[in-house]
């Protein structure tokens, strides 16, 4: 039988729900994804080309005033449940921290979230590898065009994007 692929919300809910079911008094979860491309050119030739795709989830668990934090890049239901259970066990033996808490609804109302604000702060179009290579070449060519410069340690160009989600 095929395993159901969990989406980001499912992953975060599973971690928090499992922590609560195993004795946590509260929990919050952060999930981040990023991807990108980087190219290094040296003396007109490709020296390094990298592509990355990262995924990481963090879980902070409270057992009264005892806190534990864990992170994982696993995304199977079985692994996530185990991570959440371990976090609760860690929190149970952690020293108390009376100053750490998840903000209550009352506290959050003092500083309401303005959900209608959206900041599109990046270009969402991924450039091709050739465009990134051309940008690195252009930078190196400019440096080498300076009178007296005869060698280069190379030039880098890269593109990346990421997103971070928080659930309480």
Q: Where on the chain are the PLM-derived regions?
A:
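Active-site bordering "gate/hinge" segments
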Residues: 1-168
